């Protein structure tokens, strides 16, 4: 995956906000998904 992140540090503030917004939208879309809930539970137990 490192290949795709080669210019990770060059992202503009606007681009970061767009990405964050998309992630939040995806997260809310999966809110009631049992698999997503299991993944979150697993992350919280670490």
Curated annotation (Swiss-Prot):
Keyword Lipid biosynthesis: no
Keyword Transmembrane helix: no
Annotated gene: sspJ
Region (Disordered): 24-46
Keywords: Sporulation
Protein name: Small, acid-soluble spore protein J
Main localisation: other
Subcellular location: Spore core
GO biological-process terms attached to the record: sporulation resulting in formation of a cellular spore
Pfam families documented for this protein: Spore_SspJ
Induction cue: Expression is sigma G-dependent, and to a very small extent sigma F-dependent.
């Amino acid at each position: 995956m490192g290949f795709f992140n080669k210019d990770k540090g060059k992202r503009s503030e606007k681009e970061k906000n767009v990405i964050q917004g998309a992630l939040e939208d995806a997260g809310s879309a999966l809110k009631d998904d049992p698999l997503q809930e299991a993944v979150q539970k697993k992350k919280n137990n670490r």
